[in-house]
Amino acid sequence: MHCDIYRSSKKDEMYIYIARPNYPDETEQADPFEKVPEAVLQAFGRATFVMHLELAPTRKLARVNVLHVLDSLQTKGFFIQMPPEGLINPNAVEPEGLRGA
């Protein structure tokens, strides 16, 4: 399964994978986001193209299970990769130099 990956303008490390089932035999330029609900597009913000990728069940992806991605691409036409959790701890103690700033 071929797909294009776009980065979100609203949230760091949020990506959307868009299915390209007819690649490389596509004859016309269709709207790549036509299957993505409007509410998802609003939350995602401006999409910036990152790369084209060919996915297979044996391929490893850094943060998501490729089987979940493939299933979503086949059933919905897209997959949203959310930012990793736990990178910023809102309860962390402030560094010494920033207290009271």
Swiss-Prot record:
It comes from the Bacteria. Pfam families: YcgL. Gene3D superfamilies: YcgL domain. Residues 1-92 form the YcgL domain. HAMAP family: UPF0745. PANTHER family: PROTEIN YCGL (PTHR38109:SF1). This is YcgL domain-containing protein A1S_1688. It comes from Acinetobacter baumannii (strain ATCC 17978 / DSM 105126 / CIP 53.77 / LMG 1025 / NCDC KC755 / 5377). The lineage of its organism: Bacteria, Pseudomonadati, Pseudomonadota, Gammaproteobacteria, Moraxellales.
